[in-house]
């Protein structure tokens, strides 16, 4: 259950990207796939709480409860999936991660998962929030979170700091999160262990989440970034 007030109003649309272009054949393919994705996918940027509740209800993601609360169902996953979490083994993580307790993922599998998630989202309505992690004005990260579900966008907007208008106008993400609950990963194709995957690439500054409707994965991914980088 997610508590919030409800109000009806107009919605503003903007298109945004969620992945930095990289060098190399695979990453170049991802870059061009993303450009095509931007052309045919509607991405709503920085909607406020009231707008997101309206979107969630319109999409059939939940319903209003007493007092204006938004009631949603997470589906099969009602908690985090720690055994499905992967960190891409790269130069900046190879000697810093305890691989005995953390699952690794190859760069190739991560790129394939990213491309497949982009393809899956084509033609769908998505939501992006430009937010700040950490209340410390000297040490914080700009996080761009793109979600398939409006209530996931509402959830993470409620937990992280919404930048000032000035900061938002000059916003450049330090890290990006892409969350697609309706996409299921394939262990044989993506180098994971189940249909649910949370994969982090510190080199590409990107988190991929799929196969779970539990919104807490967005929050926990941000905590992981802060714990590793700060």
Regions found by a protein language model. Give the residues of each.
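Classical Sec-dependent N-terminal signal peptides that target proteins to the secretory pathway
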Residues: 3-8
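A noncatalytic interaction/capping subdomain that flanks phosphate/NTP-handling catalytic cores
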Residues: 11-229
